[in-house]
Amino acid sequence: VNKTGIINYLEDLKLIVVLPEAGNSWYVNSPFYKNRNYEDFVIKELITFVERKYRVISTRHGRSIAGLSMGGYGAIKFGLKYPNYFYLVGSFSGAFNWRQLMDRSRYSVAQSIIEAFGEKKSEHWDRNDVFVLVDSLINKVQPYFYISCGSDDEVEGLLSSNRDFVKLIQSKQIRYEYHELPGGHNWLFWDREIKNFLRLFRECNLR
């Protein structure tokens, strides 16, 4: 929150923003650690908690989800796996290429990926791969996907994986918009995109 202007961006919006702490979990249910079921936490616990505690619209039209980098991947994954839960889904510099990052990243990142997804080519991989999950959305209610990435993103393979994912969902006639804008893998880019996403949220709620 301190690295963005989100507090100011929310001044004229009637919504609650929830920022869960997920560490390096990749927002999945870990195949190794029972206390790291972050997908279940978000979908089965957090949403229910918020909707019981606050006066909100408890349908997909009252919910959106977005994230950056690892969180961008997580938001897209949740939108694909649980389309009945969300109306609008956003990803800024989404790390869709975690398979590639496992082999090419520094140890701490690679280790977090292994702990989240398991050893190579396990069943857990396909259950959490956004490229695989796209087909599960066919003939179902679909969220609207907002995807963006910096044209100068320095994480190897990340920009190309965003382009590849957009080509895939376009071929499946899934509703989306894609913005490839000047910027890197940093808060300067993400802050602008948070503002743009909230602008889209406002427009969707005025339709």
Name each model feature, range by range.
Residues 1-207:
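Non-catalytic cap/lid and distal C-terminal segments of serine-dependent acyl enzymes
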